[in-house]
Amino acid sequence: MIIEGPVIKFGDKIDTDIIIPARYLKYTDPQYLAQHVMEPLDPEFYKKASKGVIIVAGKVFGMGSSREQAAIALKAAGVKAVVAESFARIFYRNAINNGLPVITLPNSTKEIDENSYVKIDVETGEILVGNKVLKGKGITGMALEILQAGGIMEYLKKMQTVNRN
């Protein structure tokens, strides 16, 4: 699974309240949520992301309250993947379960510049930035299968169909 696109960078400790503020949690429409993703840091983020972007961030991306809407809003906004030095565990699982690739890369914000164009091999974790190849942690096994299906619900539907035949 190869993903590519331009980079938008954020720092450390981007919590779920920044990704999608609590006042929007009563809404369920992914496209509505997308309009408010990262709003506290950049009210125009959703316009930039709509072209298809890769977020590069620092440590503990997605920390804070367990909020599935964070992954849903990012994906709906046009975020193709998130590369970070580390992730909050619950965000990591929510991202995979919603079909949003998340790649762990040491020193991510030092290695990749804003507006760089990156190409990511999700399975191996290799990230091509210009002529440089960076080695992140890839996604394999069932997590990769869930991503390839488009998320946990699509994966379960697929498995149900396979088991019926």
From Swiss-Prot:
InterPro entries per UniProt: Aconitase/3IPM_dehydase_swvl, AconitaseA/IPMdHydase_ssu_swvl, IPMI_Swivel, LeuD, LeuD_type2/HacB/DmdB
Alphabetical list of Pfam families matching this protein: Aconitase_C (PF00694)
Pathway(s) per entry: Amino-acid biosynthesis; L-leucine biosynthesis; L-leucine from 3-methyl-2-oxobutanoate: step 2/4
GO MF annotation: an example: 3-isopropylmalate dehydratase activity
UniProt enzyme class: lyase
EC number: 4.2.1.33
Gene Ontology BP terms: L-leucine biosynthetic process
Superkingdom of origin: Archaea
Reaction equations catalysed: (2R,3S)-3-isopropylmalate = (2S)-2-isopropylmalate
Keywords for this protein: Amino-acid biosynthesis, Branched-chain amino acid biosynthesis, Leucine biosynthesis, Lyase
Coiled coil (residue ranges): none
Protein family (similarity comment): Belongs to the LeuD family. LeuD type 2 subfamily.
Subunit comment: Heterodimer of LeuC and LeuD.
Task of the protein: Catalyzes the isomerization between 2-isopropylmalate and 3-isopropylmalate, via the formation of 2-isopropylmaleate.
UniProt-recorded name of the protein: 3-isopropylmalate dehydratase small subunit
Organism: Saccharolobus solfataricus (strain ATCC 35092 / DSM 1617 / JCM 11322 / P2)
Name of the gene encoding the protein in the UniProt record: leuD
